């Protein structure tokens, strides 16, 4: 087997930089070093709090680069923790169903979070929101902010090896 040699998506190394800039520019070594500092087993314990299945995220440094299995709904739920001030709130796919006369057949009220749903402190959610806004302000998702002409987009881009797949997970307040 070959040794693991992580590289940045653009193949460049830009030297030391602050966490905020490294995350915005998708510099893989920044994320790897953060995970290395806290330890992959500790991170694996935490992923379930965000709605992910811990057993699908082996406790290795590759976790920092997204090696694991999540569904799009789990990803939306996980990022929702930051958008909801630190609470894990189940995503609402259908708000309301009405008939042709406008009568409500089914209504899905907004779930009001309580402390049992808290995943992280509100201050940490704020810090993460700030970091993820930088991705859309000056980082790898800056084009989306410019195209949509919105400055209230938060999220993170990602690519697989050889850029075969690319994604964006995030939100905007509504």
Task: Label the predicted regions.
Residues 2-52, 57-84, 123, 131-134:
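Active-site-adjacent helix/loop patches that line small-molecule binding or acyl-intermediate pockets
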Residues 24-25, 69-174:
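A penicillin-recognizing enzyme superfamily signal
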